[in-house]
């Protein structure tokens, strides 16, 4: 039951150790963030959690959590399958991604709602999310789609640089190093990853559109889709995001 006692228990118990939790929200809510790579979903997710609370479940973080195998515990069945696939360099199957999200969404903190970033990416995953929520007698409150012109996304992603030694990230326009081409932290060489080159970015955007457009149509048909122009700076984009979420409270 969602009560003051449960909220206090969450703050003092396992929920306090959740990697990406914010303040306890006024009521449980469930939100998905959609949009192509480079559109700024992660930044908006952090702002949402800081302002409104709930768990931030990113599929990227789920995989990193699985790979780290926190606290030395034996991996869950889904984690074990994901780890084996990643070790082989293979793609993790839809079923395994769904199982990992189901496991993470079952943590104590997530009973107060969660924000999904990077999931669902396929129509099959969208159906699976309906099942995950249905099992706990919850429904999705909204699916927020962030969009921006392709040229702007390519500019954002192609400007990224990473230190060859310590992996610290930079951006030629938004977060430049003090010395061009050199890492502030260790002096290592800054490189552009292959998947941050313009042609690779175009390929990623095409692949995203092919798999995610049916997801957008699905949520549009259910009356859950909200569209946000993410061309502006993060704060101005968050003003649009905030207005949407405040209507859910």
Give the residues covered by each predicted segment.
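Glycine-rich phosphate-binding loop of ATP-dependent small-molecule kinases
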Residues: 1-249
């Amino acid at each position: 039951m969602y009560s003051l006692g449960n909220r206090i228990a969450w703050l003092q118990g396992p929920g306090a150790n959740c990697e990406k939790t914010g303040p306890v929200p006024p009521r449980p809510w469930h939100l998905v963030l959609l949009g192509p790579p480079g559109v700024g979903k992660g930044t908006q997710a952090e702002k949402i959690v800081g302002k409104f609370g709930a768990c931030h479940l990113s599929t990227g973080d789920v995989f990193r959590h699985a790979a780290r195998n926190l606290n030395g515990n034996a991996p869950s069945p889904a984690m074990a399958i994901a780890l084996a696939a990643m070790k082989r360099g293979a793609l993790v199957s839809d079923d395994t991604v769904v199982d990992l999200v189901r496991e993470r969404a079952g943590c104590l903190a997530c009973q107060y709602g969660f924000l999904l970033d990077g999931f669902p990416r396929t129509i099959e995953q969208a159906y699976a999310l309906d099942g995950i929520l249905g099992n706990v007698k919850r429904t999705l409150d909204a699916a927020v789609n962030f969009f921006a012109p392709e040229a702007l996304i390519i500019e954002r992603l192609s400007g990224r640089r990473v230190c060859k030694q310590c992996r610290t990230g930079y951006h030629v326009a938004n977060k430049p190093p003090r010395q061009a081409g050199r890492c502030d932290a260790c002096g290592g060489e800054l490189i552009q990853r292959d998947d941050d080159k313009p042609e690779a970015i175009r390929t990623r955007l095409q692949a995203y559109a092919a798999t995610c457009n049916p997801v957008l149509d699905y949520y549009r048909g259910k009356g859950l889709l909200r569209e946000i122009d993410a061309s502006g700076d993060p704060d101005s984009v968050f003003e649009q995001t905030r207005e949407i979420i405040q209507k859910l409270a």
